[in-house]
């Protein structure tokens, strides 16, 4: 019975594919080039229409992105603010002077309009926004990690929002997180009942 506590569950959804399958080949390339094994999405709901333009929401997203930058388990992240910041810099011939994240509602709205006009394919959804500009998605790329580490990362993200931006509803999604949670529950049910 003491060995029960030494059991460690791990349920990587990519382990179900053959080594020569296209998804494994693509994942291997992603790991080699970017250190990314799994994609995770963090959906942020401002709870109000056009809420992604609100300065409080913008500050919270930027603060969360700063937290992600410092987090050792996050290899990459991208959001609508990242894209709009890059657009702002490119409009000014790549000058790093213009590399600051937009901070005001009017600046974000102006950059959004510029983004939307630059291509017929540019839509709110292409930036991870909903059509009412109420919610935004931050895409994360994470390296290979155990199911326990994935669940801990999800909990850390939720805790960050509870402590630093309780006005935002945050939810963490992705196939790796789903498999980790299901695997933990199934393993617990097998051993504990």
Model regions and ranges:
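Extracytoplasmic
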Residues: 1-193
């Amino acid at each position: 019975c003491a060995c029960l506590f030494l059991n460690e569950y791990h349920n990587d959804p990519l382990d179900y594919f053959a080594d020569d399958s296209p998804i494994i080949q693509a994942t291997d390339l992603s790991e080699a080039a970017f250190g990314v094994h799994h994609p995770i999405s963090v959906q942020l709901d401002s709870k109000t229409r056009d809420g992604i333009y609100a300065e409080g929401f913008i500050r919270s997203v930027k603060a969360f992105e700063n937290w992600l930058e410092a987090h050792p388990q996050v290899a990459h992240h991208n959001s609508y603010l990242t894209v709009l910041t890059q657009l702002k810099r490119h409009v000014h011939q790549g000058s790093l002077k213009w590399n600051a994240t937009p901070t005001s509602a009017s600046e974000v709205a102006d950059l959004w309009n510029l983004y939307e006009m630059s291509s017929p394919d540019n839509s709110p959804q292409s930036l991870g926004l909903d059509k009412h500009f109420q919610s935004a998605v931050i895409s994360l790329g994470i390296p290979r990690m155990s199911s326990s580490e994935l669940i801990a990362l999800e909990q850390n993200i939720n805790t960050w929002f509870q402590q630093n931006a309780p006005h935002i509803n945050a939810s963490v999604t992705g196939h790796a997180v789903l498999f980790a949670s299901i695997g933990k529950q199934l393993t617990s049910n097998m051993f504990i009942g």
